[in-house]
Design a protein with these regions (language model features):
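Active-site beta-alpha connecting loops in nucleotide-dependent enzymes
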Residues: 141-144, 165-180
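Switch II (G3) loop of P-loop NTPases
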Residues: 157-163
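Acidic, Mg2+-coordinating active-site environments of NTP-dependent enzymes
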Residues: 1-157, 177
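Catalytic P-loop NTPase motifs of RecA-like helicase/translocase cores
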Residues: 4, 164-165
Length: 180
């Protein structure tokens, strides 16, 4: 995980330790959904279900996302990613589920990964594929995070409060891909 808010945690090690401690607080009937490439060891109580996710899971998309996957496949991932014309679509894949043609309401490439996590949690909690597709397509995101103010044929104006180097890079790359 990319340490953030080191003003609070002090060091990257303290940041990771906080996350590991947090995982120990999950109730035995709960679950943890964790990005597969995060280099921490969760301290789960017995009875906690553990799932992993990633954004896209094929060689072409993985090189684009620059994920460092651990061995084994993630439980939840995106497949058949289509980016262009200011839109992003993908197929959601998980244990015993495939939901085709998910459209992102906030078409930022990093939101493929965020979307997979949100969809996985929704799916694990009984939300139907139809509700998931509608929710993902209509979700406008938080204010000032890839917020479209103007969308015309030759002009696009986006307000994005990205403040972490990884967030800035992801936003810039997303704009380039959406409108290349």
């Amino acid at each position: 995980a990319d340490p953030d808010h080191l003003d609070i945690y002090g060091t990257p090690e303290a940041y990771r330790e906080s996350f590991e401690h947090f995982t120990s607080l999950i109730r035995p009937d709960g679950c943890l959904l964790m990005k597969q490439s995060i280099n921490v060891t969760p301290r789960l109580q017995e009875g906690v279900k553990f799932y992993t996710y990633t954004g896209a899971f094929d060689a072409k998309e993985l090189s684009t996302f620059n994920f460092q996957l651990s061995t084994g496949s993630p439980d939840f991932y995106a497949e058949n990613v289509r980016i262009g014309g200011g839109e992003i679509f993908f197929d959601f894949v998980g244990p015993d589920v495939r939901i085709p043609d998910i459209q992102l309401g906030v078409p930022v490439k990093v939101n493929i990964e965020n979307g997979v996590a949100a969809i996985a949690l929704a799916w694990l909690n009984g939300v139907t594929p139809e509700e998931i597709k509608h929710g993902m397509a209509t979700f406008a995101g938080p204010r000032r995070r890839f917020d479209f103010h103007l969308k015309k044929e030759n002009i696009v104006l986006i307000d994005d409060y990205a403040h972490h180097p990884a967030e800035l890079k992801a936003s810039i790359l997303s704009v380039k891909e959406l409108y290349a």
